[in-house]
Amino acid sequence: MKKRIVILGSGESGTGAALLARHLGYDVFVSDKGAVQEKYRKELDEAGIPWEEKTHTMDLILNADEIIKSPGIPEKSDVMKAVRARGINVIGEIELGYRHAGKCTIVAITGTNGKTTTTELTFHLLRTAGLNVRKGGNVGNSFAAMVLDDLLHPSQATADRIFVLEVSSFQLDDIQQFRPRIALLLNITPDHLDRYDYSLGNYARAKFRICMNQKRGDKFIYNGFDPIIAEFFEAPASGLKPAPIRKGFFKNGSIRVGVNRFDMKTGNLRGPHNMFNAVCAIRVAHLLKADPVKIQEGLNTFMPPEHRLEKVTVAGGVTWINDSKGTNVDSTFYALQAMDEPTVWIVGGQDKGNDYSPLMPLVKKKVRAIVCMGLDNSKIREAFGSLDKPLVETGSAAAAVKAAAGFARPGDTVLLSPACASFDLFLNYEDRGRQFKSAVMKLNS
């Protein structure tokens, strides 16, 4: 009798897991409480995988031998309470991928902020150096989908291949044996605490799961000057020697790793936080024996991911930057810190109980004017309204761009870094960023 695998969730992660499980010969069923996107409907139907949407049929779920849970499904959901009560083993998609990945090198990257940029940069450096590398996880393709692709094309599944994976705390919650050869922990700041009983310690421990299966000879690289990492750090019991990155790695516009210095003045990364992201990526490339000349070439040619301090255009002497991914105060702190010119700051959206006080010194020093973009801007007015700076409210990207243009002078920067979620006016942060960019280009056309 075939092993029955039930997948909860039908997005990139769930569908990738379902397709891999079907290829492995399992009896597979996909259940999603929401709607199944057309793209994934087609993939599931073509593979002959039964699925349901907008409901969870418990009789079809609780007869599973094993359940693969998509990372967005909380443990407190009704379906997970029922699954746990039944005692069914639960794993995540990256655990399934790891079981069947064969010989390879896995680089796993986590942190509250900077995961995507560091993942993309690490991948870019390794690819520029000519290594056999793929990227995925929480960005791009699911790990399971990439493993399936290797199983379907055995000639590419060589032992020298490298997977660079962005992994979230939600994904790490559901690993059992997943073991990266190189693990990176960039930072920890309070986020997603509703999933962790509002406990920062629980959230931090979820992040530290990235190294829980590592052994002697593996590498665990972490931020050695992050106070929350320091507070909750526990030395691994496996003989693994953690490798902290200390302050002082970035001096006079260059980064030193080993005996090599890498010039950061010629690339497209801005801000101290991105210098830290860069040193992490360089460390990985160095460990994997990438040619230093090629590492420098990769640093020179890398373009930051969309919506992350993304330069939109320079018009009339004003630089427009899209940092729509700045959905929390910590991200926006780094964005403002990276500004070298007087800044018109577009901020606001769906507030997540933000404390804006850490931004105050930067706003006082760097911001010329504040443009609120949201349905309810009361907390932003409360935080910054007493400053001797213009502050206006707008209700759309087009209106915010028009208002910002009125304040900006040649040599200034207009920065969209909202410090808030996007769901009051936009579908998501990508929609917010693209509407902003469209409005900027229309204004300057």
Protein language model regions, located:
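Short internal beta-strands
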Residues: 27-33, 220-224, 346-347, 366-375
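Residue-level detector of alpha-helix initiation sites
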Residues: 12, 74, 113-117, 275, ...
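C-terminal helical cap/extension that packs against the catalytic core
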Residues: 40-42, 357-412
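Short beta-strand "acidic-cap" motif of Rossmann-like dinucleotide-binding folds
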Residues: 28-32, 134-135, 164, 416
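Phosphate-binding loop of NTP-binding sites
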Residues: 3-4, 22-23, 58-62, 71-224, ...
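Nucleotide phosphate-binding/pyrophosphate-handling subdomain across enzymes
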Residues: 3-4, 16-24, 132, 265-367
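Residues in the short beta-alpha loop(s) of Rossmann-like NAD(P)-binding domains
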Residues: 11, 34, 139, 225-226, ...
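N-terminal leader/targeting and accessory segments in enzymes
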Residues: 1-92, 96, 238-241, 290, ...
